[in-house]
UniProtKB/Swiss-Prot annotation:
InterPro entries: Citrate_synth-like_lrg_a-sub, Citrate_synth-like_sm_a-sub, Citrate_synthase, Citrate_synthase_AS, Citrate_synthase_euk, Citrate_synthase_sf. This is Probable citrate synthase, mitochondrial. Its EC number is 2.3.3.16. Pathway: Carbohydrate metabolism; tricarboxylic acid cycle; isocitrate from oxaloacetate: step 1/2. It comes from Caenorhabditis elegans. It catalyses: oxaloacetate + acetyl-CoA + H2O = citrate + CoA + H(+). It is found in: Mitochondrion matrix. The lineage of its organism: Eukaryota, Metazoa, Ecdysozoa, Nematoda, Chromadorea. Gene3D superfamilies: Citrate Synthase, domain 1, Cytochrome P450-Terp, domain 2. The keyword Mitochondrion applies.
Amino acid sequence: MSLSGMAIRRLITKGVIPVCQVAPLSTSAEGSTNLKEVLSKKIPAHNAKVKSFRTEHGSTVVQNVNIDMIYGGMRSMKGMVTETSVLDPEEGIRFRGYSIPECQKLLPKAKGGEEPLPEAIWWLLCTGDVPSEAQTAAITKEWNARADLPTHVVRMLDNFPDNLHPMAQFIAAIAALNNESKFAGAYARGVAKASYWEYAYEDSMDLLAKLPTVAAIIYRNLYRDGSAVSVIDPKKDWSANFSSMLGYDDPLFAELMRLYLVIHSDHEGGNVSAHTSHLVGSALSDPYLSFSAAMAGLAGPLHGLANQEVLVFLNKIVGEIGFNYTEEQLKEWVWKHLKSGQVVPGYGHAVLRKTDPRYECQREFALKHLPNDDLFKLVSTLYKITPGILLEQGKAKNPWPNVDSHSGVLLQYFGMTEMSFYTVLFGVSRALGCLSQLIWARGMGLPLERPKSHSTDGLIKLALAAKK
């Protein structure tokens, strides 16, 4: 008797089946290497499931919304459908049901590598299946073939002034790729709504193929005197080509990129960038415009600046007490920092109630490859002392480190010290999540998003009426 993928995942979670003993759970891993063909079978089956569910439970109430939720940025309000990932308060992000450690075990890796390939997480996010090596290689081959940038985008990037922020350049270049949109062309021709996802898929594959080149040109223009990016090597994977185009030929940096791009790829649908791409996409804007808008959201300091703020914090510590500190001296410094009304960046999370697994896998990478790096040792000591301090202070619901507490330190170690570029890296990664969500939104025929808004006076009337 065979177990379903979900049943096996539950057994993994409970420890009944060790992760390392589980073969890929994919129903498509033995089949086609054509992702679009696989999706053409999965989308109708999923839509039938949704139709049946809505027929039976369409009027079921799943949450009561209170006034604080409305004024509080709709935090924790159940109001979206996102199939690609779910954030568990205890286990962290799950990509199609798989935890970070499970993805690290199960997803295909580069030859000789230890970190999962972003091509594999893309297949997983799109299908819910762990891909085979052949399916992963097919994505690599397709992205390499689609990577060329149109001349007008290269010219635009080369003509941007040096003082234009890298995220502004990234956003503009993505939008400027829209003249190649297959989705926009298909809509103009009046194709059937049921086919929208196919053109969203084509645009998404094209955009993912081109993003590393866009990002690399921005980086080389701003920080490497405009030196030309290397050409795509068809023998290299997405991350290895990206690393080379940036100017980093250390194979270990490519491994870091694989890890970074996978763990930052998706985080449910309610964060600013994912929600923005969904909202703009719901108006049937093409994936280029939708993702460009998402990146404008990511550029906001409350969304995409966190790992830079951690580095500023670490450099402040080093500037005041150096690297030859004792644990007690560091405790005193953190307490002084908190008592001055400031926070410890990189600690706490809106949903998680334990150490972020994305932090833990970066820590494991550092312990293996850079255990004696001074900044990493500072991060490690902070990890040892800060949760206890925050618990004693009594203000933090979650005193544990999140993903942003570590990523900047790893990039610094390999020589990428240009902090203003870090959000662009984040954006390249987050494209995997935003665009897989967008394909499914069009495949499911999700409608234009249009929530009802109220004035404060209107809410007062509603609240008073509810109390009668």
